[in-house]
Amino acid sequence: MRFVDEVVIKLQAGKGGNGCVSFRREKYVPRGGPDGGDGGHGGSIYLKADENVNTLIDYRYKREYYAENGRPGEGRNCYGKAGEDMYLIVPVGTSVFDLETNKKIGEVLNNGEILKLVSGGKRGIGNTHFKSSTNQAPRKFTLGEEGEYKEVRLELNLLADIALLGLPNAGKSTLIRSVSEATPKVADYPFTTMYPHLGVVKVGVDSFVMADIPGVIEGAAEGAGLGLRFLKHLTRARCVLHVVDICPFNESDPVENYFAVEKELKKYSEELYDKPRFLVINKIDLLADEVEEKCQEFVKQIGYEGNYYMISAAMKKGTEELAKKLNEFLHKQE
């Protein structure tokens, strides 16, 4: 299924039903009083998060949504039926912005969470309510109010504990495949990953969510490649894994590659740049010898002082230990 993470839609809540003007007319009751009922409230429109949905694609093809109008009141003090509310099902992690003001209306971050977007119109009042000692047969009533209208922008930011960052072909997709049940496409050409992928990593009785986004290239912060559009999906991650290919097939310099990604991340967002970050040195199986020494030299050249992990995602070497360390880190963050 195609991944869609931003759409604009129009929302119209239901109109309230009109109040009714009616009088009691029965045999042997020649002067029956007013019995006009109230109308029904108009239907409202809500957002509802569903963990089984992972894209906004349904809203790419249908852009206008109308909640049901309330029914008018009737005689014998019968109230009109309220308009049915409408629920728009979206992925967990969806935010809503008012298109006119660009202000954030809210977000749904938990499965089943509900957020009201537009309110239905209030019901009209029937003539029963206007009876008084001086007016025994009122013909006054009120109309139902119009429902609220808004144009909104839905934005999906994936909810992941760990996000993978790196150049195209750094081995991010292979890594997420090796530690979870996710099945992103893997091949030896840039931008194999066209859209973000989520994978659930299980460590004993624990589990956490890992996100793989398209590779970042130089100029991503200005819109080059695919990375810019999807860097926003790192914002809610608790930790970022910078995956570096220690033995690039194009014979580029891993040190320069590392700094290129770090530079783009900082240009895009200082907040993202300051997130906890681990270094993962991938494809160590392609190093002929002195693996540890070469990795240590690489770490020294980039001036990295934090924890780093040497793995071969393709051979699943070091990946289990990496998953355990990430799980320990997440527990400490709680």
Swiss-Prot record:
Instruction: Please report the stretch or stretches of sequence annotated as the Obg domain.
Output: 1-159
For this protein, the Enzyme Commission number is 3.6.5.-
- Alphabetical list of Pfam families matching this protein: GTP1_OBG, MMR_HSR1
What quaternary structure, including any partners, is listed in this protein's UniProt entry?
Monomer.
The molecular function terms in GO held by this entry are:
GTP binding; GTPase activity; magnesium ion binding
Question: Localized where?
Answer: Cytoplasm
Q: What does this protein do?
A: An essential GTPase which binds GTP, GDP and possibly (p)ppGpp with moderate affinity, with high nucleotide exchange rates and a fairly low GTP hydrolysis rate. Plays a role in control of the cell cycle, stress response, ribosome biogenesis and in those bacteria that undergo differentiation, in morphogenesis control.
Q: Provide the binding site for Mg(2+).
A: 173, 193
Keyword Ion transport assigned: no
Highest taxon above the source species = Bacteria
What is the organism of origin for this protein? Francisella philomiragia subsp. philomiragia (strain ATCC 25017 / CCUG 19701 / FSC 153 / O#319-036)
Q: Which protein, by its recorded name, is this?
A: GTPase Obg
NCBIfam families from the entry?
Answer: Obg_CgtA, PRK12297.1, PRK12299.1
Name the cofactor(s).
Mg(2+)
Keyword terms:
Cytoplasm, GTP-binding, Hydrolase, Magnesium, Metal-binding, Nucleotide-binding
Q: Where is the OBG-type G domain?
A: 160-331
Residues at which GTP binds: 166-173, 191-195, 212-215, 282-285, 312-314
Task: State the top-level EC class.
Answer: hydrolase
The organism's taxonomic lineage, starting at the top: Bacteria, Pseudomonadati, Pseudomonadota, Gammaproteobacteria, Thiotrichales
Family, as annotated:
Belongs to the TRAFAC class OBG-HflX-like GTPase superfamily. OBG GTPase family.
Tell me the GO BP annotations in alphabetical order: ribosome biogenesis
Query: Gene Ontology cellular component?
Result: cytoplasm
